[in-house]
């Protein structure tokens, strides 16, 4: 490969702490030597978010809307301690939440699999991609303690002034208890369905939606009906052309099936199920350091990719003291590769598509050849048994990836 690949417009968002350092190394060693990008950079480091009253996060989200591709470094979501540490004006909200609220869409998490990294669920040879509907249900519910005997009712008051409808939830006869009212909106469920179908088409894998519609006949039944209607009208022929399928499953059946499967499917989960299952699936694959997170918008055009982990504060503290660190950059690299792969799809850019695939292959091949960071060595040998010779430090590993990428691209006839 003699000339740089023209890559088009990408919005990149810098982050915090150890991941911020790794982010710059990724650009310097793995991306910019080979790809000429129209980079639109936004500094989402905590100090800059504070200085701009978090306007920079909103600006970044609007830029992603405009250019359709965003890649994001991990960022600090401040708690009381962080407010004190950085002398912040206020406890700013999660940038991921802010971006998601502006763009809409669904977050899909996917494990990066290497043959030599052991998995807790040994049968999972392909990723299981979990899409969580991050709106409504328990997370926007009104719950309360019922202090004593009495009735709990739910009332719907139509906006047009027509007759109210009241439903009895429960008559408390002997003492009190607890009660809850929760909701979701058709528009949000429709967007969730479109994002899920788009993800399945882009991966070429089947899609399953899990609910408990046998118990929540109206509530979960609505999810089931909306997905089915959209699938039949807009996606069925595309799925059949790719020889993939969509099915609804009961959540308990789905959990059991997932455990027995080899992976290789998209799993659309309601909010609470997605919260729980995404963590259990991540652990089943062995490491959060090997987990990508992609936000897919319902338009199928707009995508934002990032690592599914945090800013690796502990390593950053060591780095600040001049101590050696061995921080895993793989999920952050895959944020770039997934973003660039999407840019390539939008622009029909075969060279960029080849580069994104080569970058991911180099990461996996390097680890499978025995060159890795300490966390992965610990997955293989167990942390107490890891010796210094078993792993590379942060910078050595990045250099190794750079060297292997250079060699791989040198062989390519682009």
UniProtKB/Swiss-Prot annotation:
EC id: 1.1.1.42
Residues engaged in binding substrate: 77, 94-100, 109, 132, 212
Keyword field contains Cytoplasm: yes
Catalytic class of the enzyme: oxidoreductase
GO cellular component: cytosol; mitochondrion; peroxisomal matrix
Top-rank taxon, per record: Eukaryota
Pfam families on file: Iso_dh
Binding site for Mn(2+): 252, 275, 279
PTM sites of type Phosphoserine: 389
Site (Critical for catalysis): 139, 212
Binding site for NADP(+): 75-77, 82, 260, 310-315, 328
Cofactor-binding details, from the entry: Binds 1 Mg(2+) or Mn(2+) ion per subunit.
InterPro entries, A to Z: IsoCit/isopropylmalate_DH_CS, Isocitrate_DH_NADP, IsoPropMal-DH-like_dom
Keyword tags: Acetylation, Cytoplasm, Glyoxylate bypass, Magnesium, Manganese, Metal-binding, NADP, Oxidoreductase, Phosphoprotein, Tricarboxylic acid cycle
Modifications made to the protein after synthesis: Acetylation at Lys-374 dramatically reduces catalytic activity.
Cofactor(s) annotated in UniProt: Mg(2+); Mn(2+)
Entry's Gene Ontology molecular function annotations: isocitrate dehydrogenase (NADP+) activity; magnesium ion binding; NAD binding; protein homodimerization activity
Modification sites for Phosphotyrosine: 42
The reaction(s) this protein catalyses: D-threo-isocitrate + NADP(+) = 2-oxoglutarate + CO2 + NADPH
Modified residues (N-acetylserine): 2
NCBIfam families recorded: nadp_idh_euk, PRK08299.1
UniProt similarity note: Belongs to the isocitrate and isopropylmalate dehydrogenases family.
Protein role: Catalyzes the NADP(+)-dependent oxidative decarboxylation of isocitrate (D-threo-isocitrate) to 2-ketoglutarate (2-oxoglutarate), which is required by other enzymes such as the phytanoyl-CoA dioxygenase. Plays a critical role in the generation of NADPH, an important cofactor in many biosynthesis pathways. May act as a corneal epithelial crystallin and may be involved in maintaining corneal epithelial transparency.
Complex and partners: Homodimer.
Listed name of the protein: Isocitrate dehydrogenase [NADP] cytoplasmic
Species of provenance: Microtus ochrogaster
Lineage start: Eukaryota, Metazoa, Chordata, Craniata, Vertebrata
Gene from which the chain derives: IDH1
